[in-house]
Amino acid sequence: LSQLGTVSAVNFDNEFSVQFAQLDNQLDEDSKLQAATIFDGLRVISNHYQHSSTPVFLGGLFAYDLVANFIPMQGVELKDDGINCPDYSFYLAENLITIDHQSQQATLKSFCFSQEEQVEVAKTALSISQKLKNIDGVLSIKAASDKVSTNFEDPEFIGIVKALKHHINIGDVFQIVPSRRFSLACPNTLASYAQLKHNNPSPYMFYMNDEDFILFGASPESALKYAPDNRQLEIYPIAGSRPRGFD
């Protein structure tokens, strides 16, 4: 990592930071592709364990705003959205629980990345194993408030949509996806995710419980839905699909 950016220690808890230089927008496309970016830090970790006899889990999230680090957007200012979630967050699991939904079985896997951590990782794995044996299968559910807030009121959002329609009409763009955020209290995120999974069993679902945020959701697409009462199959195509042109 020291070959890609400036490495500095953060504290005494085996943490460090890597500062990458900002991408020079004056570079040609080939040079941009070869320049070091924050993704290279992820590649270093991924490549280090790609030949491991037991595959390790490395996963996380990229935020849409991360594109500003690679594509110059003149005149566009990214404002604080008030959501305490980073643009780039990944996890290398020491203890991993894999679930086979068909057999209803869970498997605990532990990974030790240094000899000094063997005892601690083993203790943590044993603690998790004991908790799994005594887990309560019923999630407690609390009634949520029905008070909903939004980041755009109706008149303001209508004005935004009209402005975007104008850009489509004059040929600036052919597709725009405006967003509007609705917020309400969520006293039990895991129970809410379970209900979402029941109502919308999408193959594109996620639940991330970080120290600073909890993020869960599902894409509206469903791989396949089957209704036993009328023996009907139903699919939802990927959003944004459009017919192939004839020119």
Residues covered by each model-derived region:
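Extended alpha-helical targeting/anchoring segments
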Residues: 1-247
